[in-house]
């Protein structure tokens, strides 16, 4: 092993003279190599028996055919036994087992026909032999009395350089395919358990070793999504890199890195791994061999790839510096962000970080516009783009209603919040942060609060904070706003659009919204109750603090109204139907209202005792269809009564009525519906017309089914659709002593006692969470029932409907005003930019915020195009960049480093 750049780079096992040459392609040789071996099976999935070491060695009987032992399985088992022996304090056994494993690997390597795998096996054999030598030297250098207290030498970093697996290109090869970082993929078995210690433990990313300054660092988080979804997201990023090259210069891609963090090795889909293997950014067999004997937490693959622009392989997108981080265990999306921020970003120190969910496809300029927004205004700490439904199916009410909801939320809510300076949530599916704004300083800052649910036990968090951290992105936004001594704000970038898939069935929608609703409710309460920090701790100006105070008053009233949304929806139905049906069809009125209340009660029962699945889908489907029809009938009656000027009388004569003028009637309709459409039209979003009917049909479902299910499952802190099961190299291992039977039995008893204690604690926590759920659910239902009772018995229909109309009017007027002001600011900024452009100032002002090496390449012309040409000697260039002219300091440093390797 030879140390290089703070890590350890494995040698080629040249000392084994008997081993044949691998015959691997070199950077100067052919760069097309195809692996025909199946990769669906990994030897790290083979567990060994949970027995003492001495008993497990019984399979190595003298009469056993030696050839039967010379297999991958035998070598892996020996390495696992050696690692167990080392951890249990039996170094002599570990030395012998490591030596035996190395011998087996050498013999297996001689028979391996695949040259790449042969090289990996020989390299692993060398590392295992080295480990045996290190343990042997340590054992005889430490006095016997101090041997138990002394620590053996730390296991060196297991790292492998792998020639890229490339497709047989049909036509031109990638423009930069001969550069060293394109011809080799690097694999590292990361054993660091705490991502914060990633750099301290000697691990270093390849772009960091190359001396590249990463300005934009993008993460794609994924779980078990298909390869086509990852391909779509990467292509969206590649299109943005192409636009960045037009704006910032040919080498803009060198300042951008992409980290794909996959949550769990056994959870990753086969199609996704196949896609990455086709790119040359994943190799399961090399991962299996290299990680033998290592307590792997993360499998790290690093490669620079180019995606093809078309099926003919005639042109390519700019290179992507890709980091594929495959976590060994499934620990959740937040843990993936923990690796991205605390391990990778803390090492690279990027200027901006961009969060993208796999399957979300950024527009061709969306990422660039997010970054440009923060470049132009150094006060902006975070930005959000528009999340749009990808190809909405208007014939599916579930999808169409979400399309309407997403559009109106962006047009009215995010626009208003952007004008005021605080966006309550920057969605993790597509948003960007200035890393300086969220980075921890001495363990304090927005990021530590963002990850608090990972660093604090569920028992210590409690049910309130546990639900609050289901919306950890909302906590991050508030911590960013209220950061001590700083005046960070947030901004909505309207034309930074990213398209994503949404739940297509009601069952999937219920699962998703349970976490959203509970998290947003408790996170909202947290932000409102801690707003004083904005005045006491933040560095915002007095005028900004006053504006933020008004915004938080608005949010407080909004939270109160959302609490009583269940009862107010029923009261609206009750009064409209009573005024229409009571005098002529009292029986029909009683039946409709009775079924409605019975459905609400049934939803509570189903939500408490069942998870949404196929067996409960029939009830939920009937409920949402019935309540949707009631909603449409009430809407038609209201519109008809307004247009036909029909007068109705409240049957309860003893209640004082409120007069409603024609102006108030027209104003109520205009503010309730007209301002929503007006906001959409001035923003150019005419597609909302195609989904309005579906949204109002689904509105009772959003209020009743989703709301009741959310409050009925406050004890559930999971993400709903993704479990947090763990998956390691095999079955859990029984702790082992030094071979003494009594010690092994005693240790096993201690483990069993610890398991029982943990199980009891888990049961206590679960019971306390369920008690909190039941109490809050009961309080919510009782308060809504009391409100319904008071309104129906003490307030006339005209007074109640007039009150609701005014409340809706005030909120919609505020939202419309914010939407219009946001649009005015946007138009003014564009007009100002155009005017400055004609005077030659705009480009210089924007250019001043860019890195020095980019300023010379900045082009003000929006008509710049990307071209791929061929020089006279047949060599390709990308936007004027000749592959033979890789003369930048970072490229030269990187090329020299790879040649030394």
Curated annotation (Swiss-Prot):
GO BP annotations of the record are:
cell wall organization; chitin biosynthetic process
Q: Which residues form a coiled coil?
A: none
What EC numbers are recorded for this enzyme? 2.4.1.16
Q: Which intervals carry biased composition (Basic and acidic residues)?
A: 31-48
What are the boundaries of the signal sequence?
Answer: none
Places the protein is found: Cell membrane
InterPro entries of this UniProt entry? Chitin_synth, Chitin_synth_fun, Chitin_synth_N, MIT_dom, MIT_dom_sf, Nucleotide-diphossugar_trans
Q: What induces it?
A: Expression is very weak at all developmental stages.
- Asked if the Swiss-Prot or TrEMBL record annotates the protein with the keyword Cell wall biogenesis/degradation, the reply is yes
Q: What are the cysteine partners in each disulfide bond?
A: none
Output the Pfam families linked to this UniProt entry: Chitin_synth_1 (PF01644), Chitin_synth_1N (PF08407), MIT (PF04212)
What catalytic activity does the UniProt entry give for this protein?
[(1->4)-N-acetyl-beta-D-glucosaminyl](n) + UDP-N-acetyl-alpha-D-glucosamine = [(1->4)-N-acetyl-beta-D-glucosaminyl](n+1) + UDP + H(+)
UniProt-annotated stretches for the region Disordered = 1-52
Query: Per the UniProt record, which residue ranges are transmembrane?
Result: 516-535, 560-580, 588-608, 624-644, 663-683, 688-708, 775-795, 803-823
How does this protein sit in the membrane?
A: Multi-pass membrane protein
Which CDD domains would you find in this protein's record? Chitin_synth_C, MIT
Recorded GO cellular component terms are: plasma membrane
Please summarize what the entry says happens upon disruption of the gene: Does not affect mycelial growth rate nor sporangial production, zoospore release and virulence.
State the family named in the UniProt similarity comment for this chain. Answer: Belongs to the chitin synthase family. Class II subfamily.
What name does this protein carry? Chitin synthase 2
């Amino acid at each position: 092993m030879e140390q290089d750049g703070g890590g350890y780079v494995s040698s080629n096992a040249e000392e084994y003279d008997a081993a044949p040459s691998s015959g691997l392609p070199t950077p100067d040789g052919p760069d097309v190599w195809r692996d025909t071996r199946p990769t669906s099976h990994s030897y790290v999935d083979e567990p060994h028996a949970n027995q003492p070491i001495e008993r497990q060695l019984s399979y190595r009987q003298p009469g056993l055919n030696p050839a039967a032992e010379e297999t991958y399985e035998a070598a892996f088992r020996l390495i696992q036994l050696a690692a167990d022996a080392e951890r249990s304090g039996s170094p002599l056994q570990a030395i012998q087992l490591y030596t035996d494993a190395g011998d087996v690997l050498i013999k297996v390597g001689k028979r391996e026909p695949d040259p790449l795998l042969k090289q990996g096996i020989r390299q692993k054999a060398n590392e295992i032999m080295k480990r045996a030598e290190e343990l042997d030297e340590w054992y005889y250098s430490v006095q016997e009395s101090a041997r138990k207290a002394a620590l053996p030498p730390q296991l060196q970093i297991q790292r492998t350089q792998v020639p890229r697996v490339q497709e047989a290109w049909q036509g031109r090869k990638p423009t930069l395919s001969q550069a060293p970082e394109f011809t080799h993929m690097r694999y590292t078995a990361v054993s660091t358990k705490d991502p914060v210690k990633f750099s301290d433990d000697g691990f270093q990313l390849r772009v960091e070793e190359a001396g590249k300054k990463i300005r934009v660092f993008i993460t794609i988080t994924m779980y078990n999504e298909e390869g086509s979804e990852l391909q779509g997201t990467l292509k969206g990023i590649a299109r943005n890199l192409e636009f960045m090259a037009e704006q910032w210069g040919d080498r803009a891609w060198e300042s951008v890195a992409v980290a794909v963090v996959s949550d769990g090795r056994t959870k990753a889909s086969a199609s996704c791994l196949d896609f990455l293997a086709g790119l040359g950014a994943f190799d399961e067999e090399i991962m299996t061999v290299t990680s033998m004997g290592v307590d792997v937490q993360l499998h790290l693959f690093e490669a620079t790839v180019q995606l093809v622009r078309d099926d003919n392989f005639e042109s390519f997108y700019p290179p992507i510096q890709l980091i594929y981080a495959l976590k060994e265990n499934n620990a959740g999306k937040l843990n993936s962000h923990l690796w991205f921020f605390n391990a990778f970003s803390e090492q690279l120190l990027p200027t901006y970080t961009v969060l993208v969910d796999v399957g979300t496809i950024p527009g061709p300029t969306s990422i660039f516009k997010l970054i440009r927004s923060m470049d132009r205004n150094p006060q902006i700490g975070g930005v959000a783009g528009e999340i749009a439904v990808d190809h909405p199916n208007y014939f599916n009410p579930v999808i169409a209603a979400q399309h309407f909801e997403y559009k109106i939320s962006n047009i009215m809510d995010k626009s208003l919040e952007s004008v005021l300076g605080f966006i309550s949530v920057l969605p993790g599916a597509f948003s960007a942060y200035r890393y300086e704004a969220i980075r921890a300083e001495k363990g304090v800052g927005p990021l530590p609060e963002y990850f608090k649910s990972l660093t604090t036990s569920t028992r210590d968090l409690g049910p309130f904070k546990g639900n609050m951290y289901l919306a950890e992105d909302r906590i991050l936004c508030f911590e960013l706003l209220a950061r001590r001594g700083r005046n960070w704000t947030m901004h909505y970038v309207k034309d930074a659009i990213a398209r994503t898939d949404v739940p297509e069935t009601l069952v999937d929608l219920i699962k998703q919204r349970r976490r959203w609703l509970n998290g947003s409710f408790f996170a909202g309460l947290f932000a409102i109750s801690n707003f004083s920090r904005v005045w006491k701790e933040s560095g915002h100006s007095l005028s900004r603090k006053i504006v933020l105070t008004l915004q938080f008053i608005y949010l407080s009233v909004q939270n109160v109204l959302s609490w009583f949304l269940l009862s107010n929806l029923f009261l609206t139905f009750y009064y409209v139907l009573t005024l229409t049906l009571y005098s002529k069809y009292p029986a029909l009125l009683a039946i409709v209202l009775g079924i409605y209340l019975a459905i609400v009660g049934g939803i509570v029962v189903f939500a408490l005792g069942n998870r949404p699945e196929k067996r409960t889908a029939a009830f939920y489907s009937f409920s949402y269809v019935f309540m949707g029809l009631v909603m449409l009938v009430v809407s038609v009656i209201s519109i008809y009564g307004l247009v036909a000027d029909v007068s109705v009388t409240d049957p309860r004569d003893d209640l004082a009525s409120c007069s409603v003028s024609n102006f108030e009637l027209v104003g109520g309709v205009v503010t309730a519906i007209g301002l929503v459409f007006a906001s959409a039209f001035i923003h150019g979003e005419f597609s909302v017309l195609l989904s309005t009917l579906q949204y109002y049909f689904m509105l009772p479902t959003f209020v009743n089914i989703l709301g009741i299910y959310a409050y009925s499952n406050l004890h559930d802190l999971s993400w709903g659709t993704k479990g947090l099961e763990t998956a390691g190299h095999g079955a859990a291992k029984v702790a082992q002593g030094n071979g003494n039977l009594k010690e092994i039995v005693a240790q096993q008893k201690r483990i069993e006692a610890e398991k029982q204690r943990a199980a009891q604690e888990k049961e206590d926590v679960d019971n306390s969470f369920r008690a909190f759920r039941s109490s809050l659910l009961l309080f919510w239902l009782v308060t809504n029932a009391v409100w319904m009772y008071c309104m129906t018995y003490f307030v006339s229909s005209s007074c109640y409907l007039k009150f609701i109309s005014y409340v809706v009017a005030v909120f919609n007027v505020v939202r419309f005003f914010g939407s219009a002001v946001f649009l005015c600011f946007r138009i003014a900024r564009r007009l100002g930019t155009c005017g400055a452009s004609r005077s030659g100032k705009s480009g210089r002002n924007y250019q001043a915020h860019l890195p020095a090496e980019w300023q010379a390449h900045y082009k003000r012309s929006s008509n710049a195009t990307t071209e791929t040409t061929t020089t006279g000697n047949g060599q390709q260039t990308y936007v004027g960049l000749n592959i033979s002219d890789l003369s930048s300091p970072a490229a030269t440093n990187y090329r020299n480093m790879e040649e030394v390797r």
